[in-house]
């Protein structure tokens, strides 16, 4: 006699599969692969990296049990309070010591604090920085002392590198009057650097062409930053124009009003 076929509901099938997974499937998945065979497609959880730690403790203490017996747990014993969470706390920055000059960070020997992704993916692999260990700090302190004593070549500072980068993109205009005789000198150029570009340049750090500049035209000047880097800045000598300040604009308005008043009086 043939056995009768019954249709198993889909919900029952899913429940049976779930029970089978709970019995053996998950255990096999979590069991460490200790054999020397080639690993399969399952992930080896025993060798996976722990990315964080969460420490909790019971809110209610579990009473002591007799020898050889397990303590009796109640529902209140399954209430926990958080002690420490290293997985979700803010990530700390990475302290490094620069071995070379890096834009917007610093120069060799500077102690910087950057994101871990920046340090591990860019600075450390490219050899631009090293870890700020006590040994490395001591080495760079000794190097700094040797540079101060003059036994090693000096290096450009962070502000100096920013100044050099800025000067390479500048164009200086020097205004000279046409009613007097003049000759351009480093003091005049230094004042125009401060007035037009906002850069303080010492006269001894400026170098002009050997031929005297007594006429308007296109010239150049060289600026030496901290005695290390020299930048050639294009320079235009133009006719002097009075700066259009509020006081000067008010004076121009008064002159225009006086001129209009005199013209109308002559017509009358």
Swiss-Prot record:
* One GO term (biological process): translation
Q: Which Gene3D superfamilies match?
A: Ribosomal protein L9, N-terminal domain (3.40.5.10)
Which Pfam families is this protein grouped with?
Answer: bL9m_N (PF25131), Ribosomal_bL9m_C (PF22078), Ribosomal_L9_N (PF01281)
Task: Look up keyword Mitochondrion and say if it applies.
Answer: yes
Keyword Cell division on entry: no
Q: Tell me the name of the encoding gene.
A: MRPL9
Specify the protein name.
Large ribosomal subunit protein bL9m
Its GO CC terms are: mitochondrial inner membrane; mitochondrial large ribosomal subunit; mitochondrion
Membrane spanning segments where? none
Lineage of this protein's species? Eukaryota, Metazoa, Chordata, Craniata, Vertebrata
Q: How does it assemble?
A: Component of the mitochondrial ribosome large subunit (39S) which comprises a 16S rRNA and about 50 distinct proteins.
